[in-house]
Amino acid sequence: MRTFLLAALLLAPAASLSAQTFDPEARLKELGITLPTPDKPVANYVKAVRTGNLVFLAGHGPCGDFNRPDIQGRVPSQKSIEQGYEIAKLTAICLLSSLKQEIGDLKKVKRVVKVFGMVLSDQGFDRQPSVINGASDLFVKVFGERGKHARSAVGMYALPFNITTEIEMIVEVE
């Protein structure tokens, strides 16, 4: 019993410290990232749906005008894997923007649960995970362990507006 109480007392300050230092928005600022205003949906849907403690985020591309050559094109014939990685990162920033709009404060994130990443791909290309790492790496940089998630990374023949990446996400929140 004494050992249990001692362990509880030793761990309690660490738990409260980690809760105090968890500040995803400060981390974004450290990374030089400013969240944009979320785009309006382009059809009859919403960007995020909260049910209970889960937020389901619709498929997102990079925020802003989709008719930009810098975010369009197939991997690897029109965009390199490295360019795809950066576009996936931009897509993740847009997802975080919609998530913040839905929940108000990114400190409410308990866990990034699932990421579904789609890459506009040439036939035979099989390195989609290397592209979607752009989003996954950002989520871990912003949320730490809470950002580690289950994931699918798949190739697509077509994506809306010829964008290079489209990503969906499920997040557990307080």
Regions found by a protein language model. Give the residues of each.
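Short, polar/acidic, helix-capping and beta-turn segments at strand->helix junctions
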Residues: 19-174
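Sec-dependent N-terminal signal peptides
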Residues: 4-13
